[in-house]
Regions:
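Conserved aromatic beta-strand anchor motif in extracellular beta-sandwich/beta-rich domains
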Residues: 128-130
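Aromatic (Trp/Tyr/Phe) and Gly/Pro-enriched flexible surface segments
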Residues: 8-106, 112, 116, 122-126, ...
Length: 168
């Protein structure tokens, strides 16, 4: 799955570096989401970062997973949301908001997702979790939360992707 331009409250985006444009270091290979400023993977297997400035596996639009243009800017992130028989562990994205969420305020969450061209399987749910502490898992594996209020139920297909949004 490919993500771009992640979270907002009306006109004020509370996610720093929402289109993954600002990076620290050199992007050389898959699993380097951690060089995008403010972005992390909470498990031992990291998410991917793709850039128009690169070719091959990490290029935009053509890369290891097929062809996808960035929705905003020249970069985007990619995660593994499902693999048959869990052959390849899931990967996740994590970022700290630029300011804390206030009680009694409605926030609009919106992000773009697209199934990669070379994916054999699609998912019908994707979630977002808000917490006061960063999530961390020192191994490869699934992160499952019992609170399902942050789930989006859509079938993600490779046909141009979807903009998913909800109010919290």
């Amino acid at each position: 799955l490919i993500f771009s331009n992640i979270l907002g409250q009306d006109q004020n985006n509370l996610v720093g570096n929402p289109s993954f444009e600002s990076i620290d270091g050199k992007l050389k290979k898959l699993t380097q989401i951690n060089i995008a400023k403010g972005w992390y993977s909470p498990t031992a297997l990291r998410a991917d970062l793709f850039s128009k400035d690169k070719e091959g596996d990490i290029g935009v639009p053509d890369n290891f997973y097929g062809k996808e243009h960035a929705k905003d800017g020249e970069n985007y992130a990619g995660i593994v949301a499902y693999s048959y028989n869990n052959n390849k562990p899931r990967t996740y994205l994590q970022s700290k908001l630029t300011k804390s969420l206030a009680g009694g305020v409605d926030y609009c969450v919106k992000f773009n997702v697209s199934l990669s061209d070379l994916s054999k399987y699609a998912i019908d749910k994707i979630g977002i979790h808000f917490g006061s502490d960063a999530v961390s898992l020192d191994r490869k594996g699934d992160i499952i939360f019992s609170d399902k209020s942050g789930e989006f139920e859509h079938i993600i297909t490779p046909m141009g992707g979807k903009v998913l949004s909800a109010r919290y």
